[in-house]
C-alpha cells in the first residue's frame, strides 16, 4: 500500500514545531511543522480544540507552515487530524522567547575540540536599556542581524558577519566592551559519553526495587486513598520538561493522541522517534501509562499538563528560552535533567571530567544567562520551582566555576543526586538500603537524592544517571503542589528534607568527602532532636511521606 495514497495506520506524528519567518514580529507568528504520515489528503489542524482555517495553513511535502495573524490568544496544544487519525499533541506557546539553531555549516571546532556556533551569539543587555532597540543598534554597528530573543531577560540573538573563529572571537570581545552589554553568550555542544555514568557494567536491576527505595508505590496508594477520603480540593498543576521530544510509539505514550480531557494527565511533545531516547525516559517517569507517577494517581488526580519542549536545538540558550515561555504559560514545576561542566573540572578522584564539558568562554556566558533567569524568576514568578540534576561527573555539584546550573544558590532551584539499591538485605528505612550512585555529583548543594537507575519493561539494560532521579523528585513536587498550591519553594524543600529517608554514614559536617551525597540532615529537620539517628546522613526522597506532609501543611501555619 503506497503512503502517497493515504496515511498509513497510526503514523501521523508531529516531529518538529518551531517558529520560522520573522521570530521578532509582534503582529504575526509563523510556525513550521515537520510531519510524518500525512499522505495526500489535506490535514485538519486544531489549536486548543479549535479548527484552524485552511487558509492559515500551507503545505509543502511533509512541511506545514502555520500563520497566526493575531498571536495574542492563549497558548494551547496543537495537533493534526487526517482520516480519523490524530497526531501527538504539541504545545504551541504564544510567548515571545525564541532562538535559532545553527545549521551544519554554521559550526566549527574550537581549541578544546568542542563544537561551537560560528556566527550566532546572544547578547545580554543591561536591564536599564530597551533591549530590542539596543540590540538593533549593536547589530547595525557590527554589520550583524537580530534573529532571536528571550525578551523577558533582555537577551537577543545576533547573526554575525564572520567566517572563522578568529573573526568571531574578535567581534565577541568588541561587543563585550559595549556599555549596555552585560555578557555575550557563545553556544557550544559536546558529545556525552555513551550512557550517563562512566560506562561500568551495571548489575541486574529491578525497576520496582529501585523505586521502592523512594516509596513510589506507597505514594501512589496514599494519593489514591487519602485524597478522596479527606475531600481535599486538589488543583491541576502544569509541569515543564526541558527535553527534545517523546517517542509516541513507545508503549507508555501510545494513548496520548489528539485532545486530552480535563482532569487527566496530558502529555504535549514533539515525536522523538527513539523509544530509548533521553526525553522519552524522563517524560515517562512523569506520565508513561502504567509506569509514570502522575499518570498512576488515578481518579483522585486533578489533572497534570506535562509539556515537553526545548524551543529550537540551540543548546543551553534554547533551554532557557523554552523555560521562560513555559513559566509564562503557567508552569509551576520545571524539570531540568541537564547540566554542564567547565573544561578542566575534576572529579572526586582528581581525574578530569570528560562528559558534557564547555569552554571557559561559553561557561561565563551561560553563568550570566542563568543568573538573569533566576533573578527574573524570583522577581516575577516566585512560586515556580526548578528541579535540576546534580550531574554524573562523580564531581562536586556546587562549585560554581565548574558546574552549571546546579551550583546556583537560590530557593527556587532544587538539586537532585542519584542513588541505587545496595547489596544489603535490609528494610527500606535503613540507611544501608541504598548506596550513592558512583557517578553522581555530590556535596552540600544537593538537596535530596532519588533512584538513578531506570529499566523500562522493554529495555535490555538499565539506564542510569541523575537525569532519571530528577523527575521522581519533580513529580513528587507537582503532586505536593496539587495538594497545597500555596506552598512556596522554600517550604517544598523543607518538607522534602523533613520527610526524607536517609543513606550513607553520618557526616562530620566538615568538607564533603567522596561518600557524602547531599547536604546532611540537620536537627531542625528532625524536630530539634539532637539524638536522632538520621542526623548527619544524606537525604533520600520519601515520596509517600512528602505527600503526607503536604496534606498536613494545609492546616498548619509554619
Positions of the model-derived regions?
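Beta-strand/beta-sandwich contexts
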Residues: 5-42, 85-113
